[in-house]
UniProtKB/Swiss-Prot annotation:
Topology with respect to the bilayer: Single-pass type III membrane protein
The protein, known as: Glycophorin-C
Record field: compositional bias (Low complexity): 22-33
Gene coding for it: GYPC
Assigned protein family: Belongs to the glycophorin-C family.
Location of Phosphoserine modifications: 104, 122
Length: 128
């Protein structure tokens, strides 16, 4: 039933001692010895086990995953670069033309034609 394999493929039985509080009963233990390694594995004299070589299907699956990740990364790079260059320089300010030569900010804004009222000049708005 339960066995432990040693490096040289012999089996040792595990000790199953009965519980001291239980009545004694006869227990039969089966041990098995395995003379050869498991199928699909080839044993080495020093106790190492060599795994089987990967199949073609394993290689195809791994290559597909790597290709999908590469395509996603290239797509993201393309989208990021396109977005960066498309929006480069689109920040516009609405400053009045010729304000760099004015003596003060008020004088520059008084001469700006975009800020002149076409109608009533008696109404003024003050910002505090």
């Amino acid at each position: 039933m339960w066995s432990t394999r040693s490096p040289n493929s012999t089996a040792w039985p595990l000790s199953l001692e009965p519980d001291p509080g239980m009545a004694s009963a006869s227990t039969t233990m089966h041990t098995t010895t395995i003379a050869e390694p498991d199928p699909g594995m080839s044993g080495w004299p020093d106790g190492r086990m060599e795994t089987s070589t990967p199949t073609i299907m394993d290689i195809v699956v791994i290559a597909g995953v790597i290709a999908a990740v590469a395509i996603v990364l290239v797509s993201l790079l393309f989208v990021m670069l396109r977005y960066m260059y498309r929006h480069k320089g689109t920040y516009h300010t609405n400053e009045a033309k010729g304000t760099e030569f004015a003596e003060s900010a008020d004088a520059a804004l008084q001469g700006d034609p975009a800020l002149q009222d076409a109608g009533d000049s008696s109404r003024k708005e003050y910002f505090i």
